[in-house]
Amino acid sequence: NASALNIAANITTADGLIDINAPVTLTGDAVITSGTGGGNVDFSSTISGGQNLDILSGTGNVIITGDIGGTALTSLDINKTGAGNTGSIFLSGNIGTDSAAGEGAVNLGHDGLTLSITFGSTGVAGDYNTTGDQIYEADSYVLSGTDPTFATVDDAVTFNDGGLTLATASNLTINTGSGTAGAITIQGDIAGTSDGSTTTVTLEAGSGAVAIKGIGTDIGNVTIDGGGVTLNGSITTAGGNIDINDATTLATGAITLTTANG
C-alpha cells in the first residue's frame, strides 16, 4: 500500500473491485468506474484536491471511509448517471468541516438508485459542508453519525425519493444560509429510532423555501425556518416542540401537528 496517492486520470475495471487504501489527492479530473457488475469502489482513507471526482459502481457499493475535502473538491458525483449504477453508498467520514466546505456541488445517486445512502459513523460528528448544491437521490437514507449537519451558503439541499432514518444520537441540522436560493427539499419522511430516546430536527433555510413530508417516530424538538414552508405530511414529536417560523402551506388533505403533550 502506498503512503499517498495522486490521481490525475480515470480508473476503470470490468466488474472488478477498486480498493484504494492510501490518502488520495486529485491532481486532475477523474472518473472511477468498476463496470456494471458487483465491483465495489472502496476508498479507505481521505480524498482531497480541487478537481471533479465521478464514481460509478454498477451494482457494487461505494464505500468512502475517510474524510473528503481537506483541500476542497470542485464536485463529487457518485452513481449520478446510468440506469445500471444502483449500488449503495456509504460515507463514513465528513465532507469538509463545521467551518470549511469540502467541495463545490455534490450529487449522490439518481432516480434509478434502489438502495440506500448512509452518512456517518456511530460516535463521530457528521459534517457535510459544500459551496454548491447538495442533491441526494435514493430509496432510503440512514444517518448514523453524531449530530449530522448539512450546510451550504445559499445553495440547495435536496433529499429525493426516500425517507431519512436518524440514529439515536443523530440530531439533524440542515442550514443553507440566509439567501433565497438555499431551498431545503425532503421528499420522504424523517424518522427517529424507536429506542426510547429522541432526536431533534432543525431546518434553517434563511429566505429559501422549505418543503418536507412527514416527521415522526421518537422525534424531539422540530424547528423550521425559511422563506415559506410546505408540509406534505404530518409532524409528531415524542418529547419536544414544533416551531415553524414562516408562512406555511398544507399541500395535502389531513395534516396534523402533534406534540408529546398534545
PLM regions with names:
Residues 1-262:
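Extracellular lectin-like interaction modules
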